[in-house]
Amino acid sequence: RDRSVSRGLGDVYKRQGLVVVDTGSYWSAFGQAVILLLIQTGGLGVITVVASFSMVSGRKISLMQRSTMQDAISAPKVGGIVRLTKFILQGTFLIELIGAILMLPVFCRDYGWKGIWMSVFHSVSAFCNAGFDILGTTEQTFPSLTGYIANPLINLVIMLLIVIGGIGFLTWDDFCTNKWNLKRYRLQSKIILVTTAVLILLPAIFFFLSDFAGFSMGKRILASFFQSVTLRTAGFNTADLGAMNDSSKAIMILMMLIGGSPGSTAGGMKTTTIAVLILNAFATFGREPETEVFGRRFDNTVVKNAATIAILYFFLFFAGGIAISQIEHVALSDC
């Protein structure tokens, strides 16, 4: 039991959302607060959190620390990294606060004063792409957000929090600096936004056509988009994923491998990696000498790095699945 709990806490910190006990019914209020703190730390990153303490205490941040912060948030340069870190911290807490306030009417209606804690917890969990929920009871464990499958407010707020947290801090910076003038965005931000939109829209359309046939039109649209948004990085669900068809599950596996974007609260192979590989494939088929997008050419090193990351991810994915299948004596498709 102790080992199970420690594994669960590890998943909290690593933003995976996997649990061995129901978070809502198993843990006390203090335990849930610790989990929330770990989710927030994992979402922002240890380096960002440590740097924030240094800034609050008035300590000078060394060049080496600035370089580490640059790597942690995938910033293009060391210059302005402290300003960017402050922007990330302020933006994070503001967005999480807005998300919590928007969900208050629904959760307070259903849970009374406890709804305040529910709103805060799920706002942070969604923004940090953790996928943890505290809606479980001793009678119904691991419900996730299935009770709110037809609630537009909860669906839309959670989806927006997941997407905003998953597109990366530099993309926020571009939006706040350049507003809707997309031409002035960094190349990375442009790729992230286009890839994210495609990776949300295409699976949602597939789910809409292949699953949820018994739902009303509005409920079906919400369920399709919610599952598409959450499966890549977060881990919430409003529908019974086990009841979805095998083709949908295969798409889910691929989307989970891709994950979120660089410098974000999400994990995975990253949207930019898959985008570079697809663009390089099109360039190869078109017999183009170099990979180009938005008028910019990729260095061959970028393409090689993307291919290396993808190969490593797929190797670890299959190796992990085979290992679990052999150890637990279950079908490989269930791993």
What residue spans do the PLM features occupy?
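Membrane-proximal intracellular helices of multi-pass ion channels
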Residues: 1-335
